[in-house]
Amino acid sequence: INRKLDAMNNITIDDMKALQTENYNIKAEFAKDILLKTDESKLSADEKKYFDIYRSWNLRNDPQEKGATVFAVWWKELEKAIWSDEIDKSGLPLPWPNEATLVESLHKDSAYHFLDNINTPSKETLEDDLLASLKKITDTLKIVEANGNLEWAKFKGTKVQHLLKIPALSRLHLPIGGGNGIINATKEDHGPSWRMIVELSSPTEAWGVYPGGQSGNAGSKYYDNFIDLWAAGKYFKLWFMHEGDRLDKKIKWTMKFEKG
């Protein structure tokens, strides 16, 4: 966010809309030179295929990007290869270190202690872990691709669930990008929902949207009519009421409270 703001001048409403829906993956940017150390000569045809998809990826988690899926699956498996032998063996419910910690450590130390698998007699290196993790995920990616889900939005499967998690009353498989560690932090079922931008002009103006609707009746067209607009990064102009608006025709009813 700071990088984006530093590059902006005379920021407009459209600039802020673009910022709130920004899908650039800065974690992937910092990790790319690490993953590109993979020895391509040791890859099978299928492994090379997914490596090339990743290498040509533009580092954006846009809905149609396949490289974002390869990166997410590969990075998760690489983390497992590096951390699980030591941490899981402790027998304690310890969390793995932060992803940024791993990226920083691998940049600073190519012989990072945790690269070695303590359960094998050999001493594994970064190259070994990169190869092993990519080989391990290739079959998974082949299945994902065969099911037509290699594009990021289809793989991520963002959904807006009913409070009772009833699928028929939920909206599933939304075509939206973003993800963990991205400004648009939309994950499978969590992330930024209500988006709002307020311009402190005179008069004050505001824009907003949320993934839902204005009716709780699942049979109403207003039950979920904002969701597609939200997924597409669209906004509504909000009505910022002033004292003289109390008789405006847009007001459908009023509520008066009296002491009992």
Question: Where do the language-model regions lie?
Answer:
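C-terminal/peripheral segments of proteins
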Residues: N2-G260
